[in-house]
C-alpha cells in the first residue's frame, strides 16, 4: 500500500485525548501502522543519567496509530483524505481530495 502519511507532513489528530491538535510527523513506523507527531501523545519516562545528560523525568512523543491522524489540507488546514494521481512527468503524487491541492511539493 502506498504511504499516505510521510515524514514532515502536517497532520491533525482526529481522535483521542489530543483531538484537534496539529503537528509535524517526526517518524513513520510502517510495520506497526503508527506515526510519531511533534507535541502529541506526550509521555514521561525516567531517563538514566549519562555523561552528557543528567537524566531524570523526560517527556517524549509516543507513537499514535495512523487511523487517529489525518493530513492537513495545504489550502485551509482542515483534515482531508489523500488521493494519488500521476503528474505530467509520470510521477505518482499525493493530493487533497477535498480541494484538489497537491500535497507533495
UniProtKB/Swiss-Prot annotation:
Coiled coil: none annotated. It comes from the Bacteria. Part of the 50S ribosomal subunit. This is Large ribosomal subunit protein uL24. InterPro entries: KOW, Rib_uL2_dom2, Ribosomal_uL24, Ribosomal_uL24_KOW, Translation_prot_SH3-like_sf. One of two assembly initiator proteins, it binds directly to the 5'-end of the 23S rRNA, where it nucleates assembly of the 50S subunit. Keywords: Ribonucleoprotein, Ribosomal protein, RNA-binding, rRNA-binding. SUPFAM superfamilies: Translation proteins SH3-like domain (SSF50104). One of its GO terms (biological process) is translation. PANTHER family: MITOCHONDRIAL RIBOSOMAL PROTEIN L24. Disulfide bonds: none annotated.
Amino acid at each position: 500500500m502506498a504511504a499516505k502519511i510521510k515524514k514532515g507532513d502536517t497532520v491533525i489528530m482526529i481522535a483521542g485525548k489530543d483531538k484537534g491538535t496539529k503537528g509535524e510527523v517526526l517518524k513513520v513506523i510502517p510495520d506497526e501502522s503508527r506515526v510519531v507527531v511533534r507535541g502529541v501523545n506526550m509521555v514521561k519516562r525516567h531517563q538514566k543519567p549519562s555523561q552528557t545528560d543528567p537524566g531524570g523525568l523526560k517527556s517524549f512523543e509516543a507513537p499514535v496509530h495512523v487511523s487517529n491522524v489525518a493530513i492537513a489540507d495545504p489550502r485551509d488546514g482542515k483534515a482531508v483524505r489523500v488521493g494519488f494521481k500521476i503528474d505530467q512527468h509520470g510521477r505518482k503524487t499525493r493530493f487533497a481530495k477535498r480541494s484538489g491541492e497537491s500535497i507533495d511539493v
